[in-house]
Amino acid sequence: MKRSVLPLVGTAFQQGKMKEAIEQIQDTDLAEIARGERYYFSAQAGACAEAVKNYLTSEDLMLRLSADMLYAFANLTLGNAREAQMAREDVRNCLQKSLEEDVTDETKAACIFACYLSSIFLHIEPEKGIPPLETCINHLPEGQRLFAVSVLAHGMYLKKEYAKAQGVVQTAMLLSDQVYPIPFIYLHCIAAMCQINQKDQEGAIRSVTRAWELAHADQLMEPFIEYHGLLQGVLEVCLRKSEPETYKKLVDGIIAFSRGWMKIHNPQMNTMVTDLLTPLEFSIAMLACRDWTNQEIAEHLGLSVNTVKHYVSAILEKLHLDAITPAP
């Protein structure tokens, strides 16, 4: 069997059948990586790190890159910034090696994809000199290619190219021959991020609902944990009242992940993303920064205007601010 990076990401398994899909992988090393993916995407960071750590020094680049990415992101949640950064640096070393040696286009594409993922995911610009991801994305298998499209679209989102990013992810899903649950969850979430920034609340809610329909049977909660802040309250609208226990689990994951994320993002970008706010407060602050009125925020989140005012006052007090300034 030809190995590829992140095998579970590239598997079109039926909803609720993720474990069975892993059991069908005959390559024992790929199966172990897939188990690590299962742990990661179901928000079991400790189990993920344990499952993949033996592959961090593998001679097989597909196994090593997979382990690096999973280990880096799992350690964000675990609060181990040093371990996460070391895994990110190894991805860069693998890419450099692939550019210097005669490797297949598929291997080079996997290295470039891993580099972009480990940077854009943290809102860090990829290093100069790295080949553009779009020039090699066609060398990835379909499922991994769809996941790479989500990374490209995330980069567009960070440049505030919301309509373009939304078009890219929706087109990618339309053109896919099969439903790949993990990439599709990310693509739907990015569509929602773009829609809410264009004040298309109904569209954003539909996108998150579709993502959750793909995720809930296998408890694939990690994408929602990662994108919570950028979803700007849509997750609260979809789950806070209808599935309170699930939302509580997500909140616990959001707090742990965001603190680890900031440990790498803030020093690298010389910016300070705060960890003083609760997830709901952060969502309200994000909306206020984008010039939403208290009335609009209240209607979006299903709260009273007075409740929103109370939250805004608490946010200002925690951040020692006089007012929330709209984002440029």
Residue ranges with predicted function:
Residues 2-14, 30-44, 65-81, 107-124, ...:
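Tandem amphipathic alpha-helical repeat scaffolds
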Residues 3-25, 37-54, 76-95, 119-133, ...:
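Helix-turn-helix repeat elements of alpha-solenoid scaffolds
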Residues 22-29, 53-64, 89-106, 131-145, ...:
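Solenoid-like repeat scaffolds
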Residues 273, 291-328:
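Recognition helix of helix-turn-helix DNA-binding domains
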Residues 282-283:
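Pre-recognition alpha-helix immediately N-terminal to the DNA-recognition helix
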Residues 286-290:
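Short, amphipathic alpha-helical "recognition" segments used to contact nucleic acids or chromatin
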